[in-house]
């Protein structure tokens, strides 16, 4: 997903990477510890999922329980994201070596061996999965589903123009958050599906915008993606994803009977925040994309959370 598209133009120079010992820095770079956008994209769906559950639960969920689940799910998402980055680079090593923005990554430049990268992937997934012992058993099934699609993602760009579709699985954070709090997604099927699709479409939208930076080189190498497939109509695609995601978020609020504050703060904040992102990046320019995306996604997450938190407070 966005994990696979967090490109680097030079060997690790970021201050955060410089704080690691020389032998560890390439592994930290491989895990993208210095690229915050990926952490935002993978962690915020779980935060939103917990807030969503709190606002629709028929009984009040204690704040201590909400904080406990938030911490555990955040830990899981951080390890998931890091493992996904390593796995993507391992599978894409031959392609990354042919693209200027990625050929300086640890694997193409030989700073990390494929064997060590594989072992790191397994270790990270295992560490993330360890939090499941503190969560209800249905979360283990959710974990397996999310992990399966995370492993599948890097293969998609070799065989289909729509590898970003697998990123919809990040929206599975919603049912996982519900299971962690003892709520049954099937009893709230319509809003759960809407929230799932909302998260998935937002992730796809950002990934498409980010992937656009390398469209020309991807065409030469043979990398497939929606950014390549719709390179002549990338603006139409991006705005369509924005409108669709806004619609699904609004429908989730409608099906659960959320109030005006949710629609003004969460839905309105989401639309305005990403509309500004699309305008600022002009939907195809590479300059400043990551910086704009980080700011827009961070602010949008705050709007999503504030709307749900207000509803939680009003209902309780």
Swiss-Prot record:
It is found in: Membrane. One of its GO terms (biological process) is terpenoid biosynthetic process. Disruption phenotype: Drastically reduces the production of andrastin A. Keywords: Magnesium, Membrane, Transferase, Transmembrane, Transmembrane helix. Pfam families: UbiA (PF01040). Pathway: Secondary metabolite biosynthesis; terpenoid biosynthesis. It is a multi-pass membrane protein. One of its GO terms (molecular function) is 4-hydroxybenzoate polyprenyltransferase activity. It comes from the Eukaryota. Its cofactor is Mg(2+). The chain crosses the membrane at residues 36-56, 60-80, 131-151, 163-183, 191-211, 247-267, 294-314. Signal peptide: none annotated. Its EC number is 2.5.1.-. PANTHER family: POLYPRENYL TRANSFERASE AUSN, PRENYLTRANSFERASES. Belongs to the UbiA prenyltransferase family. Prenytransferase; part of the gene cluster that mediates the biosynthesis of andrastins, meroterpenoid compounds that exhibit inhibitory activity against ras farnesyltransferase, suggesting that they could be promising leads for antitumor agents. The first step of the pathway is the synthesis of 3,5-dimethylorsellinic acid (DMOA) by the polyketide synthase adrD via condensation of one acetyl-CoA starter unit with 3 malonyl-CoA units and 2 methylations. DMAO is then converted to farnesyl-DMAO by the prenyltransferase adrG. This is Prenytransferase adrG. It comes from Penicillium roqueforti.
């Amino acid at each position: 997903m966005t994990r696979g598209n967090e490109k680097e133009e030079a060997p690790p120079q970021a201050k955060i990477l410089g704080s690691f010992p020389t032998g560890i820095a390439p592994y930290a770079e491989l895990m993208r510890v210095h690229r915050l956008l990926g952490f935002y994209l993978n962690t915020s769906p779980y935060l939103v999922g917990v807030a969503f559950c709190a606002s629709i639960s028929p009984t009040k969920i204690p704040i201590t329980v909400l904080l406990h689940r938030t911490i555990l799910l955040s830990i899981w998402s951080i390890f998931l994201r890091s493992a996904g980055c390593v796995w993507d680079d391992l599978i894409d090593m031959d392609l990354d070596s042919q693209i200027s923005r990625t050929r300086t990554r640890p694997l193409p430049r030989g700073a990390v061996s494929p064997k060590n990268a594989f072992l790191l992937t397994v270790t990270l997934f295992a560490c993330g999965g360890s939090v499941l012992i503190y969560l209800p058993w249905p979360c283990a099934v959710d974990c397996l589903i999310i992990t399966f699609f995370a492993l599948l993602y890097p293969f998609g760009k070799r065989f289909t123009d729509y590898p970003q579709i697998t990123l919809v699985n990040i929206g599975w954070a919603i049912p996982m958050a519900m299971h962690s709090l003892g709520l049954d997604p099937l009893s709230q099927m319509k809003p759960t599906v809407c929230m799932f699709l909302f998260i998935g479409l937002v992730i796809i939208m950002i990934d498409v915008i980010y992937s656009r930076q390398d469209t020309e080189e991807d065409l030469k190498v043979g990398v497939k993606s929606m950014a390549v497939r719709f390179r002549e109509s990338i603006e139409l695609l991006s705005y369509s994803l924005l409108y669709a995601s806004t619609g699904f978020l609004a429908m989730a609020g409608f099906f659960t009977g959320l109030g005006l504050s949710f629609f003004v703060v969460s839905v309105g904040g989401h639309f305005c925040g990403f509309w500004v992102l699309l305008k600022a990046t002009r939907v195809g320019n590479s300059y400043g994309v990551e910086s704009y995306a980080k700011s827009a996604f961070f602010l949008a997450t705050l709007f999503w959370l504030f709307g749900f938190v207000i509803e939680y407070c009003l209902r309780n």
